[in-house]
Amino acid sequence: MERLGTYEKIASFIQKEKQPYEFKRKYAQIRAKEFATECDGRGLNYHVSVGGLDSIILYIFLHEVCGIDVPGVSASTLEDKSIQRVHKALGIINVPPLKRDDGTYWTKAKVIQEFGFPVISKEVAAKVELLQNPSEKNKTVRHAIITGETGEYGGWQKNSKMQLNQRWLKLFGGYENETEGCDFQKPDFLVSAKCCYYLKEKNCDDWGKEHNSVPYLGLMASEGGRRAKSLRMNGCNYFGASTIRSAPFAIFGRQDILKLTLEMDGLWKNGLKEKYYEAGLKEGRITEKFKMPDSLIPEIYGTIEKKPDGTLYTTKAQRTGCSMCGFGIHMEKRPHRFDLLHESNPKEWNYLMFHMCKDKDGNDYGWAKVLDYIGVGWDPSTIGGNCKGQMNLEDFM
């Protein structure tokens, strides 16, 4: 049979995304088992990369529905306390951050102090970081970021996607004012996309290599972003030259994952919690005093409720990540992630807002300065009356 071309693959994938929940659930089960079987044949181990709600549900789905005995691995210390609690209840392996040259571990504050704040998006942050660190080697790329004009390597394009969105050019393009003859602003803080690498990506990848293990991921193409096209091109299971991974939920939408969450949470509340408690005691991971969470849904998400039209939603956070991550913050309605952090952990909020970094004069500063600069409200007393943070989708690019 002739291999499907890229467009045919994407069209076939999109068609599967339109199928009902029951089809997607069964499809995920089939693909998950196929991945395990193929890995077994190749002599590979496998694990679940666990973070927030989607991957927590994937872990339970693989164990309790697919019958696949697979460990969960996470950089848990980056997650919200309520997520960490669920991780502990499930026996998720916590992988520490990378070590620095001085032997200490990288922390959120150390990464941001040295490299910069993760703000807007990974793509935009990486471009701003290049502007803040000019060299002869990245001269052509910096020109493209400001003007959209690419050289021979980029096909001599005009108005290419390399150019920053005008909103971000205005705020971050000032590093090239003299070179490009423009009049943009520049902040007095650094911007970077390196946090994920130092705090969770590289260390979890290293764990995988050390254990000859490849990951199951809780990714969905419906979330969009850079991974969406890759998922639609390569499907749920991918065995490449340098990358091997499974994303059983790749064809799921938000409603599908919330339906499955309610289903898995029902299992948890009807005997599964006790099963994991006994296993944790037996393995010495928890003590008898450890209070198992009543729900698989971490408290940061609230509960899953249904609108009059039947649409499911979480009453608190819709998405989560590292508590100090600012990617996408400008797209969120208030109360946004930092507002919710103020409610759940005011001490951490205060540290992140005002004390996590020091300027050249030794004065403390934090996310409050960054959010002010990009026009996102953060003062808890202004919730409901401050909509500065709301932008359109183009601002995310």
Model-identified regions with their sequence ranges:
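ATP-dependent adenylation/nucleotidyltransferase module used to activate substrates
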Residues: E2-D256, E263
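ATP/NTP-dependent adenylation/nucleotidyl-transfer catalytic domains that generate, transfer
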Residues: E2-I14, R42-L44, R254-K269, E274-M397
